[in-house]
Amino acid sequence: MNVGTNLGKPPYRLNVGCGRNIQEGWVNLDSAALPGVDIVCDLETLRETPIHLPDKTVDHFLLSHVIEHIRDSLGLMQELWRLATPGAIAVIRVPHGGSDDAWEDPTHVRAYFPNSFGYFSQPFYWRADYGYRADWKPDKVTLLVDRTRCAGLNPQEIFTKTQYERNVVKEMICEMRAIKPMREPKQELQTSLQIEILPA
């Protein structure tokens, strides 16, 4: 792992899997030592080799078209939770599982849907324990829908269309919050997901 020396003082804002999308004022992290990258590390091996930052030092995370490339997404989210301050915000942008964008890229290893993000919270593990020890509460999922295909439809009609037709959602954005201390894995602690639909 390679860590830059000019990270400033915490709390940090961490741009995870930044690639060439360098964000000014953020700590930019990627698996490749590209210009502007502050921390180089392998996002697939975070259970064995954690990110070289102290616990509870990051209050904002950005993962823009990253998580769909990661085989061990639970390991990634667990490591980010370690770094998160209580109440830290993570914004995850991904292709919707019902779009060609989710499947055409051979480097994508899994598809995501609005309810997928609940599996990064503890209450979703009331039935089974996979060793995941983190708790991210999905606050809102925004579906950016094809403006032409959804013209004249109300939000419920659009949402129904996203459930049964392909390529309606161009992009999905999930906003999650780090819950610390971690909640118990109890079904009754699950909360309803707020879904926002916006034209793209």
Please state what every model-predicted region is.
Residues 1-12:
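Conserved alpha-helix/loop element of class I SAM-dependent methyltransferases that forms part
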Residues 5, 30, 164-166:
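Short secondary-structure boundary/capping segments
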Residues 9-10, 34, 180, 198:
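Intrinsic-disorder/low-complexity coil detector
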Residues 11-98:
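Conserved SAM-binding loop
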Residues 74-75, 79-81, 85, 89-200:
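S-adenosyl-L-methionine-dependent methyltransferase catalytic module, highlighting the catalytic core
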